[in-house]
Amino acid sequence: MWIYEGKEFLEEHVPEDGFGFIYEMAAIVDGKSVRYIGKKNFFADVKTKLAKKDMPTDKRLKTYTRKRKFTYQNYFSSNEVLKTAHKDGVVIKREIVRICKSKTELSYWETKLQFVYGVLESDEFLNGNILGKFYNIK
């Protein structure tokens, strides 16, 4: 269950102009409190091959792009520690920190919050890098 502004976040709460969200996950793994800050898209563009009967007269166009909803309800982070903890039955608190309207805004807020919380300096956070440029110094 995702929490946003103190309430359960359901699919009908996804805004029309929403692109994705920034989340914070928290759990107790092996007796230690851990947290993770990340981002997740509501939708993805998926390229699909056209069937022969659907091909236009211009044969160069062989694929089309469609939007696909992500199943964020069942998402438990890209972090392996949290994925394993979830499979082992550990309760993970999943909170949406901010909903963003564009890819740029999503990356900006993820990066900003990771620096503000000091995820690379703190042992409590599981984040190993920020933007793939700044790495864990623990």
Specify the residue positions occupied by each region the protein language model found:
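Conserved short loop/helix modules at catalytic or binding sites
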Residues: 40-103
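GIY-YIG nuclease catalytic motif and its immediate N-terminal context
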Residues: 1-49, 138
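Glycine-centered flexibility motif
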Residues: 31, 40-41, 78-79, 127-134
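Boundary/linker segments flanking structured domains
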Residues: 1-17, 92, 97-138
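Intrinsically disordered, low-complexity segments enriched in small/polar residues
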Residues: 2, 7, 21, 34, ...
